């Protein structure tokens, strides 16, 4: 009996959305890097809402907790607001990767980033030192995880190649661009 094993991949389901899927398990850095200025604004407003409302309520109807009570409540509200604002910011950005909100800008950014990596001969989704089976486990655990953010915030920090998209489009676009560059250089000489 042979004890060799081949890597097993679980084909991920693709959700039916109005916009194209970019990546169903984007790396944390990509989600932050592709965020729009409006995501930062929404996250900041959501984060400031907690301490802002607590301050407003204290001014409108003082709680009378005594010296030192209100600052502790404000520190807690600020910490909760900071994490809540960050999660809202992150979720707005990652939902565009899933194709659940308008993502034309991100589709172009993704195509440019991946085609540049193909041209440079780099792996599309980074290099990982983890074994393939551990990469697969990480992919299965964090795929579409932002849909469950309200219960359990879960991020992808692992480089792997299981992202639910056909990567052939990147290689085909790189070939077209390289051919256009070659023809452009040939006609100019």
Curated annotation (Swiss-Prot):
Complex I is composed of about 40 different subunits. Its EC number is 7.1.1.2. Keywords: Membrane, Mitochondrion, Mitochondrion inner membrane, NAD, Oxidoreductase, Translocase, Transmembrane, Transmembrane helix, Ubiquinone. The chain crosses the membrane at residues 73-88. GO terms for cellular component: mitochondrial inner membrane; respiratory chain complex I. It is found in: Mitochondrion inner membrane. It comes from Neurospora crassa (strain ATCC 24698 / 74-OR23-1A / CBS 708.71 / DSM 1257 / FGSC 987). Disulfide bonds: none annotated. The keyword Cytoplasm does not apply. InterPro entries: NADH-Q_oxidrdct_subunit, NADH-UbQ_OxRdtase_su21_C_fun, NADH-UbQ_OxRdtase_su21_N. One of its GO terms (molecular function) is NADH dehydrogenase (ubiquinone) activity. It is a single-pass membrane protein. It catalyses: a ubiquinone + NADH + 5 H(+)(in) = a ubiquinol + NAD(+) + 4 H(+)(out). This is NADH-ubiquinone oxidoreductase 20.9 kDa subunit. Transfer of electrons from NADH to the respiratory chain. The immediate electron acceptor for the enzyme is believed to be ubiquinone. Its main location: mitochondrion.
């Amino acid at each position: 009996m042979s004890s060799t094993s081949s890597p097993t991949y679980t084909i991920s389901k693709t959700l039916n959305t109005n916009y194209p899927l970019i990546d169903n398990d984007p790396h944390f850095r990509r989600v932050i890097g592709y965020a729009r200025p409006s995501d930062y604004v929404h996250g900041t407003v959501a984060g400031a809402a907690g301490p802002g409302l607590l301050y407003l309520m204290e001014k409108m109807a003082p709680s009378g907790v005594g010296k030192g009570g209100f600052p502790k409540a404000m520190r807690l509200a600020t910490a909760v607001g900071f994490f809540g604002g960050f999660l809202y910011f992150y979720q707005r950005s990652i939902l565009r990767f899933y194709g659940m909100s308008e993502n034309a800008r991100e589709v172009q950014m993704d195509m440019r980033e991946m085609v540049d990596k193909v041209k440079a001969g780099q792996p599309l989704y980074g290099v990982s030192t983890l074994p393939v089976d551990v990469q697969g486990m990480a992919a299965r655990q964090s795929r579409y995880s932002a849909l469950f953010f309200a219960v359990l915030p879960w991020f992808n920090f692992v480089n792997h190649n299981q992202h639910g998209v056909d990567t052939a489009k990147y290689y085909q676009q790189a070939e077209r661009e390289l051919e256009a560059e070659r023809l452009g250089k040939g006609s100019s000489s």
